[in-house]
A protein has these predicted regions:
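Catalytic domains that recognize anionic headgroups
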Residues: 1-305
Length: 305
Protein backbone atom coordinates (compact mmCIF):
# COMPACT_ATOMS: atom_id res chain seq x y z
CA UNK A 1 0.00 0.00 0.00
CA UNK A 2 0.97 3.65 -0.49
CA UNK A 3 -0.48 6.92 0.85
CA UNK A 4 -2.56 7.24 -2.34
CA UNK A 5 -3.16 3.58 -3.16
CA UNK A 6 -5.24 1.14 -1.14
CA UNK A 7 -4.06 -2.33 -0.19
CA UNK A 8 -3.89 -4.65 -3.18
CA UNK A 9 -3.12 -8.34 -3.31
CA UNK A 10 -0.63 -9.67 -5.84
CA UNK A 11 0.93 -13.08 -6.42
CA UNK A 12 4.64 -12.68 -7.05
CA UNK A 13 5.68 -16.31 -7.37
CA UNK A 14 8.45 -18.18 -5.59
CA UNK A 15 12.21 -18.63 -5.86
CA UNK A 16 12.90 -15.52 -7.92
CA UNK A 17 12.96 -11.75 -7.60
CA UNK A 18 10.16 -9.51 -8.85
CA UNK A 19 10.50 -5.82 -9.62
CA UNK A 20 8.03 -3.01 -8.89
CA UNK A 21 8.31 0.60 -9.98
CA UNK A 22 7.71 2.85 -6.96
CA UNK A 23 7.25 6.61 -6.88
CA UNK A 24 6.02 6.99 -3.27
CA UNK A 25 6.68 5.38 0.13
CA UNK A 26 5.31 1.85 -0.10
CA UNK A 27 4.52 -0.84 2.47
CA UNK A 28 4.92 -4.46 1.39
CA UNK A 29 3.50 -7.24 3.54
CA UNK A 30 3.10 -10.98 3.12
CA UNK A 31 -0.36 -12.49 3.57
CA UNK A 32 1.15 -15.67 4.97
CA UNK A 33 3.48 -15.66 8.00
CA UNK A 34 6.48 -16.42 5.80
CA UNK A 35 9.77 -14.57 5.38
CA UNK A 36 10.55 -12.73 2.17
CA UNK A 37 13.47 -10.68 0.90
CA UNK A 38 13.40 -7.06 -0.22
CA UNK A 39 16.32 -5.82 -2.26
CA UNK A 40 18.02 -2.45 -2.12
CA UNK A 41 16.01 0.16 -4.06
CA UNK A 42 17.35 1.01 -7.53
CA UNK A 43 17.46 4.79 -7.88
CA UNK A 44 16.59 6.07 -11.35
CA UNK A 45 18.02 9.20 -12.92
CA UNK A 46 21.15 10.35 -14.73
CA UNK A 47 24.01 12.56 -13.62
CA UNK A 48 26.21 14.75 -15.81
CA UNK A 49 29.15 13.46 -13.74
CA UNK A 50 28.59 9.91 -15.00
CA UNK A 51 28.12 8.12 -18.31
CA UNK A 52 24.78 6.48 -18.96
CA UNK A 53 26.52 3.17 -19.67
CA UNK A 54 29.95 1.82 -18.74
CA UNK A 55 30.29 -1.72 -20.11
CA UNK A 56 33.22 -4.06 -19.42
CA UNK A 57 33.38 -7.23 -21.53
CA UNK A 58 35.84 -9.91 -20.41
CA UNK A 59 36.45 -12.46 -23.18
CA UNK A 60 38.16 -15.19 -21.18
CA UNK A 61 41.38 -16.63 -22.66
CA UNK A 62 41.70 -14.26 -25.63
CA UNK A 63 45.37 -14.30 -26.80
CA UNK A 64 45.63 -10.82 -28.30
CA UNK A 65 49.04 -11.41 -29.87
CA UNK A 66 47.41 -14.16 -31.98
CA UNK A 67 44.17 -12.34 -32.74
CA UNK A 68 45.70 -8.91 -33.44
CA UNK A 69 47.02 -9.75 -36.92
CA UNK A 70 43.62 -11.25 -37.88
CA UNK A 71 41.40 -8.82 -35.96
CA UNK A 72 39.32 -7.45 -38.85
CA UNK A 73 39.03 -10.93 -40.40
CA UNK A 74 38.20 -12.99 -37.29
CA UNK A 75 36.25 -10.33 -35.38
CA UNK A 76 34.88 -7.94 -38.06
CA UNK A 77 31.96 -6.58 -36.03
CA UNK A 78 34.00 -5.90 -32.92
CA UNK A 79 36.92 -4.54 -34.98
CA UNK A 80 34.62 -2.07 -36.72
CA UNK A 81 33.28 -0.82 -33.39
CA UNK A 82 36.70 -0.32 -31.81
CA UNK A 83 38.20 1.24 -34.94
CA UNK A 84 36.84 4.49 -33.51
CA UNK A 85 38.35 3.84 -30.10
CA UNK A 86 41.67 2.95 -28.51
CA UNK A 87 43.35 -0.45 -28.98
CA UNK A 88 46.18 -1.51 -26.65
CA UNK A 89 48.74 -3.82 -28.29
CA UNK A 90 51.23 -4.14 -25.42
CA UNK A 91 48.99 -4.95 -22.48
CA UNK A 92 49.78 -8.06 -20.44
CA UNK A 93 47.95 -10.11 -17.83
CA UNK A 94 49.42 -10.66 -14.39
CA UNK A 95 48.57 -14.40 -14.48
CA UNK A 96 47.94 -17.18 -16.97
CA UNK A 97 44.62 -18.34 -15.47
CA UNK A 98 41.46 -16.64 -14.29
CA UNK A 99 41.39 -17.14 -10.53
CA UNK A 100 44.29 -14.77 -9.74
CA UNK A 101 44.00 -12.67 -12.91
CA UNK A 102 40.44 -11.41 -12.43
CA UNK A 103 41.02 -10.05 -8.89
CA UNK A 104 44.05 -8.20 -10.25
CA UNK A 105 41.86 -6.61 -12.94
CA UNK A 106 39.09 -5.71 -10.51
CA UNK A 107 41.40 -4.24 -7.85
CA UNK A 108 44.43 -3.01 -9.78
CA UNK A 109 46.61 -5.09 -7.45
CA UNK A 110 49.05 -7.85 -8.33
CA UNK A 111 48.33 -11.38 -7.16
CA UNK A 112 51.01 -11.14 -4.48
CA UNK A 113 48.90 -8.35 -2.99
CA UNK A 114 45.49 -10.04 -3.24
CA UNK A 115 46.94 -13.47 -2.29
CA UNK A 116 44.23 -15.10 -4.43
CA UNK A 117 45.82 -18.00 -6.27
CA UNK A 118 43.80 -21.19 -5.85
CA UNK A 119 40.13 -21.68 -5.00
CA UNK A 120 40.67 -24.74 -2.79
CA UNK A 121 43.14 -22.94 -0.52
CA UNK A 122 41.98 -19.37 -0.51
CA UNK A 123 40.32 -16.63 1.49
CA UNK A 124 38.26 -13.49 1.01
CA UNK A 125 39.85 -10.48 -0.64
CA UNK A 126 41.06 -8.01 1.97
CA UNK A 127 38.60 -5.21 2.68
CA UNK A 128 41.55 -2.84 2.39
CA UNK A 129 41.40 -3.34 -1.39
CA UNK A 130 38.47 -1.61 -3.06
CA UNK A 131 37.06 -3.42 -6.07
CA UNK A 132 36.04 -1.74 -9.31
CA UNK A 133 32.42 -2.57 -8.50
CA UNK A 134 32.68 -0.83 -5.13
CA UNK A 135 34.25 2.25 -6.70
CA UNK A 136 31.59 2.52 -9.41
CA UNK A 137 28.80 1.99 -6.90
CA UNK A 138 30.22 4.80 -4.77
CA UNK A 139 30.04 7.04 -7.86
CA UNK A 140 26.31 6.36 -8.13
CA UNK A 141 26.17 3.68 -10.83
CA UNK A 142 23.77 0.76 -10.72
CA UNK A 143 26.29 -2.07 -10.86
CA UNK A 144 25.47 -5.45 -12.38
CA UNK A 145 27.03 -8.52 -13.98
CA UNK A 146 24.35 -10.23 -16.10
CA UNK A 147 26.67 -13.18 -16.78
CA UNK A 148 29.76 -14.31 -14.86
CA UNK A 149 31.47 -17.28 -13.21
CA UNK A 150 30.85 -18.24 -9.59
CA UNK A 151 34.39 -18.47 -8.23
CA UNK A 152 34.92 -14.70 -8.23
CA UNK A 153 31.90 -14.19 -5.98
CA UNK A 154 33.00 -16.20 -2.98
CA UNK A 155 36.46 -14.66 -2.74
CA UNK A 156 35.13 -11.09 -2.75
CA UNK A 157 36.26 -10.02 -6.21
CA UNK A 158 32.69 -9.11 -7.18
CA UNK A 159 32.05 -6.95 -4.13
CA UNK A 160 30.12 -3.81 -4.95
CA UNK A 161 27.80 -5.30 -7.56
CA UNK A 162 24.09 -4.81 -6.98
CA UNK A 163 23.04 -7.64 -9.28
CA UNK A 164 24.89 -10.84 -10.19
CA UNK A 165 23.68 -13.63 -12.49
CA UNK A 166 26.24 -16.44 -12.33
CA UNK A 167 26.61 -19.82 -13.99
CA UNK A 168 29.02 -22.69 -13.53
CA UNK A 169 31.24 -23.91 -16.38
CA UNK A 170 29.78 -22.06 -19.37
CA UNK A 171 29.16 -18.36 -20.03
CA UNK A 172 28.20 -18.12 -23.74
CA UNK A 173 28.25 -14.75 -25.46
CA UNK A 174 24.81 -15.28 -26.99
CA UNK A 175 23.20 -15.42 -23.56
CA UNK A 176 25.46 -12.67 -22.25
CA UNK A 177 24.56 -10.26 -25.06
CA UNK A 178 20.86 -10.97 -24.67
CA UNK A 179 20.97 -10.47 -20.91
CA UNK A 180 22.92 -7.23 -21.33
CA UNK A 181 20.32 -5.82 -23.72
CA UNK A 182 17.50 -6.89 -21.41
CA UNK A 183 19.34 -5.28 -18.50
CA UNK A 184 19.72 -1.99 -20.38
CA UNK A 185 16.06 -2.06 -21.39
CA UNK A 186 15.00 -2.70 -17.80
CA UNK A 187 17.28 -0.29 -15.95
CA UNK A 188 18.40 2.19 -18.60
CA UNK A 189 16.87 5.09 -16.67
CA UNK A 190 19.76 4.71 -14.23
CA UNK A 191 23.47 5.14 -14.98
CA UNK A 192 24.74 1.59 -15.53
CA UNK A 193 28.05 -0.08 -14.82
CA UNK A 194 27.79 -3.54 -16.38
CA UNK A 195 30.25 -6.44 -16.52
CA UNK A 196 30.08 -9.49 -18.81
CA UNK A 197 32.35 -12.53 -18.38
CA UNK A 198 32.29 -14.72 -21.51
CA UNK A 199 33.84 -18.17 -21.98
CA UNK A 200 33.17 -19.04 -25.65
CA UNK A 201 36.84 -19.31 -26.59
CA UNK A 202 38.22 -20.68 -23.33
CA UNK A 203 40.03 -23.97 -24.09
CA UNK A 204 38.96 -27.09 -22.23
CA UNK A 205 40.48 -30.55 -22.06
CA UNK A 206 39.01 -32.69 -24.84
CA UNK A 207 38.42 -35.48 -22.32
CA UNK A 208 35.75 -33.36 -20.64
CA UNK A 209 33.60 -31.83 -23.38
CA UNK A 210 32.48 -32.02 -27.01
CA UNK A 211 33.87 -29.76 -29.69
CA UNK A 212 31.84 -27.29 -31.72
CA UNK A 213 29.84 -29.20 -34.36
CA UNK A 214 31.29 -27.07 -37.17
CA UNK A 215 34.77 -27.97 -35.95
CA UNK A 216 34.13 -31.71 -35.95
CA UNK A 217 32.49 -31.69 -39.39
CA UNK A 218 35.18 -29.66 -41.17
CA UNK A 219 38.49 -30.99 -39.86
CA UNK A 220 40.23 -33.78 -41.79
CA UNK A 221 40.31 -37.06 -39.92
CA UNK A 222 44.00 -36.87 -39.01
CA UNK A 223 43.31 -33.61 -37.15
CA UNK A 224 39.92 -34.62 -35.79
CA UNK A 225 41.35 -37.72 -34.04
CA UNK A 226 44.25 -37.55 -31.62
CA UNK A 227 45.73 -39.67 -28.87
CA UNK A 228 45.38 -37.95 -25.52
CA UNK A 229 44.59 -39.96 -22.43
CA UNK A 230 45.58 -37.73 -19.53
CA UNK A 231 43.48 -35.02 -17.93
CA UNK A 232 45.17 -31.67 -18.54
CA UNK A 233 44.63 -28.20 -17.13
CA UNK A 234 43.61 -25.65 -19.74
CA UNK A 235 46.82 -23.64 -19.23
CA UNK A 236 48.85 -26.69 -20.34
CA UNK A 237 46.85 -27.91 -23.33
CA UNK A 238 48.95 -28.83 -26.41
CA UNK A 239 48.86 -27.06 -29.76
CA UNK A 240 46.50 -29.50 -31.49
CA UNK A 241 44.78 -28.14 -34.58
CA UNK A 242 41.38 -29.11 -33.20
CA UNK A 243 41.90 -26.79 -30.20
CA UNK A 244 42.78 -23.93 -32.55
CA UNK A 245 39.72 -24.62 -34.69
CA UNK A 246 37.56 -24.68 -31.56
CA UNK A 247 39.01 -21.31 -30.60
CA UNK A 248 38.18 -19.77 -33.97
CA UNK A 249 34.63 -21.16 -33.85
CA UNK A 250 34.11 -19.65 -30.41
CA UNK A 251 35.58 -16.37 -31.61
CA UNK A 252 33.03 -16.22 -34.43
CA UNK A 253 30.28 -16.65 -31.83
CA UNK A 254 31.72 -13.85 -29.70
CA UNK A 255 31.99 -11.49 -32.66
CA UNK A 256 28.49 -12.22 -33.93
CA UNK A 257 26.79 -11.96 -30.54
CA UNK A 258 28.75 -9.08 -29.05
CA UNK A 259 28.53 -7.32 -32.41
CA UNK A 260 24.76 -7.33 -31.98
CA UNK A 261 25.11 -5.83 -28.50
CA UNK A 262 27.49 -3.13 -29.74
CA UNK A 263 25.12 -2.21 -32.57
CA UNK A 264 22.30 -1.93 -30.04
CA UNK A 265 24.42 0.44 -27.95
CA UNK A 266 25.29 2.58 -30.97
CA UNK A 267 21.61 2.83 -31.90
CA UNK A 268 20.41 3.77 -28.41
CA UNK A 269 23.16 6.03 -27.02
CA UNK A 270 25.02 9.10 -28.19
CA UNK A 271 28.77 8.65 -28.61
CA UNK A 272 29.60 10.57 -25.44
CA UNK A 273 27.10 8.67 -23.29
CA UNK A 274 28.89 5.32 -23.06
CA UNK A 275 32.27 3.67 -22.54
CA UNK A 276 32.85 0.07 -23.68
CA UNK A 277 35.99 -1.92 -22.85
CA UNK A 278 36.72 -5.41 -24.19
CA UNK A 279 39.67 -7.28 -22.72
CA UNK A 280 40.87 -10.64 -21.43
CA UNK A 281 42.33 -12.09 -18.28
CA UNK A 282 44.92 -14.32 -19.97
CA UNK A 283 45.83 -15.98 -23.26
CA UNK A 284 45.93 -19.59 -24.44
CA UNK A 285 48.61 -22.28 -24.52
CA UNK A 286 47.15 -23.96 -27.63
CA UNK A 287 49.05 -21.53 -29.86
CA UNK A 288 52.44 -22.41 -28.36
CA UNK A 289 54.21 -25.11 -30.46
CA UNK A 290 56.23 -27.61 -28.45
CA UNK A 291 57.29 -31.23 -28.37
CA UNK A 292 55.77 -33.56 -25.78
CA UNK A 293 58.91 -33.49 -23.67
CA UNK A 294 59.23 -29.70 -23.73
CA UNK A 295 58.05 -27.74 -20.68
CA UNK A 296 55.35 -25.15 -21.28
CA UNK A 297 56.24 -21.51 -20.80
CA UNK A 298 53.12 -20.54 -18.88
CA UNK A 299 54.22 -16.92 -18.62
CA UNK A 300 54.98 -16.61 -22.33
CA UNK A 301 53.09 -14.01 -24.35
CA UNK A 302 50.64 -16.57 -25.79
CA UNK A 303 49.46 -17.26 -22.25
CA UNK A 304 49.56 -13.78 -20.77
CA UNK A 305 48.95 -11.27 -23.57
Amino acid sequence: STPTHADQLAYLGQWFYSYMRLSAPTTITCEEPAPFAVGTPILLGHSARRHKLVLNILVDALPWNIVRTHFSEWMPNIARFFSNGTIFDAHFSTSEYTYPALPAIETGRYAHHTQLFQADASHELSRAFLTLGECMKDLGYYTAAPILTTDSIYNGTMRGYDRLISTVWNQPSGIGAERAIHHIEAFGEADLFTFLHLSDIHPWDAMGFNFHTAVETHLPLDQRLFAWEKATASVRLPDFEIYKAQFRAGLRDVDRNIGTLLSYIENHYEDDEYIVSLYSDHGSSVFTPRRDEDPLDIIGENSTM
